Amino acid sequence: MLLLLLKWYLKYYISTYMDNRPSKGNFLEILLRSSKTVFSVQDVALLWGESESTTITNRLKKYIRAGKLLRVRHGLYAKDENYDRYELATRIYTPSYIGFETVLTREGVSFQYYGNIFVASYLNREIEANGQKITYVRMKRSVLSDTTGINHVNGVAWATKERAFLDRLYVTKEYHFDNLNVLDWDKVFEILTVYENKRLEKQVKKYHRNFVNTQ
């Protein structure tokens, strides 16, 4: 009886788990079908159902040599040259989100152009990844982990313009913003509580007061 139960369990396990693993020709196809444009080894392990890291990296190296995948950073791979550079920027150091001048410029709060991608993370660092300069700005852990004012678009975390405004003032005491008309001040004061910082509260009230007086 015990032997029969064991045989049944093995049959069930193989049909349920092993049969669902990709066949040899489908490994690359699974990556190409994914909504991600940038993959870590951990991402690939989950997509392939493979726990052996050596097997994964060897297979990835084979695809890179064949020109079917692109290595964009140590431990990070892309489908091709058209990968999302913002996705890459938030995958190198995590947790992180796109913010500061990248958002402020896109949203019309600041008019100066920056070629760098600015990212809020847990460290200060400037790097170049596959020709793209990325500036990481250190934020306090409690602030970084609070998702108030953070939106996720196509798998990439983005600060809202109000969050980017506050983040910049949080790390830079004095800063010139070209256009505060586009900010929702109710949202600014809502997000402000995340920082628990008296100096920042005073600074934001000053910017708001000056803004109101010029209207």
Residue ranges and their predicted role:
Residues 1-18, 213-215:
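Intrinsically disordered, low-complexity and often Lys/Arg-enriched segments
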